[in-house]
């Protein structure tokens, strides 16, 4: 399971700058310049600890995979980058085993899983979709 410490430890170990930036177009944005990465966090758009965890986990997926795109990129390229970041997030922090443990503990609804993992429902949905549709794994109650 993801902890904010995972994000900050990774960023420190890989020399990724984490910069608060008000007025960004999204709660979190990752950029690369000459091989160096920075994650910008707009705390005016991050209204809860759960959302902060989700944003940091997702942006970590962008940094770890290098899945970035230009602002002017076509929609298909943007979606490909987002998919890669979401896939990395599922493979590292919302694993098949994590879901099996959650289901075994009685957490089966999307909102319950979001509470269990302390992540936004959309992140849980993305990971469940990845495991069920891409890896053909089913989670039963």
Labelled PLM ranges:
Residues 1-141:
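Active-site hotspot residues in diverse enzymes, especially metal/ion-binding acidic/histidine motifs
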């Amino acid at each position: 399971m993801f902890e904010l410490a995972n994000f900050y430890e990774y960023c420190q170990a890989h020399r990724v700058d984490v910069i608060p930036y008000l007025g960004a177009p999204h709660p979190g944005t990752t950029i690369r310049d000459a091989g160096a990465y920075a994650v910008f966090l707009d705390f005016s758009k991050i209204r809860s600890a759960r959302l902060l965890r989700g944003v940091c986990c997702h942006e970590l997926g962008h940094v770890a995979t290098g899945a970035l795109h230009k602002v002017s990129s076509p929609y298909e390229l943007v979606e490909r980058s987002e998919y890669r970041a979401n896939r990395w997030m599922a493979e590292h922090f919302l694993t098949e085993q994590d879901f099996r443990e959650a289901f075994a503990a009685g957490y089966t609804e999307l909102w319950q899983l979001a509470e269990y993992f302390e992540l936004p429902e959309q992140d849980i949905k993305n990971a469940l979709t990845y495991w069920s549709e891409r890896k053909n794994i089913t989670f039963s109650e």
